[in-house]
């Protein structure tokens, strides 16, 4: 992961790659969550997409479990446009709040931004706490 972060930041300056780990008393480090927003995707969203984000997550299964969250928009051709993604263990209020803070850091608060999410526990509160009413939040 650290190599991925270093390579992405070197080849795509301005991209945001946040890796959050937990360090135990014995010195072991455990992965908690990750957020990625590639600069070209963020710039494309801000310059040419509707001020709309659809955000949802899906379960990861296999060797590593968790959630893969994605923020997508709609471009000028009405196609899905990827903006950012994150990986975390489960859909908790703390993990969603962390994801939204990283996303806001990446895109700011574009005028007229509408965010669509599902009715996941803690998600509505996290959006409100991070964007503080500056966006319209809809639940589908």
Report each predicted region and the residues it spans:
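DNA-binding interface regions
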Residues: 1-140
């Amino acid at each position: 992961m650290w190599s991925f972060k270093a390579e992405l930041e070197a080849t795509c300056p301005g991209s945001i790659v946040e890796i959050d780990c937990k360090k135990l008393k014995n010195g072991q480090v455990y992965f908690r969550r990750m957020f990625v927003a590639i600069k070209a995707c963020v710039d494309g969203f801000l310059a040419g997409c509707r001020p709309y984000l659809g955000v949802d997550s899906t379960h990861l299964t296999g060797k590593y479990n968790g959630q893969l969250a994605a923020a997508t928009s709609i471009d000028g051709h009405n196609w899905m446009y990827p903006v950012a993604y994150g990986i975390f263990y489960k859909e908790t209020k703390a993990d969603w709040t962390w994801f939204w803070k990283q996303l806001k850091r990446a895109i700011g608060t574009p005028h007229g931004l509408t965010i669509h999410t599902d009715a996941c526990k803690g998600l509505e509160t996290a959006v409100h706490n991070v964007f503080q009413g500056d966006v319209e939040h809809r639940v589908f």
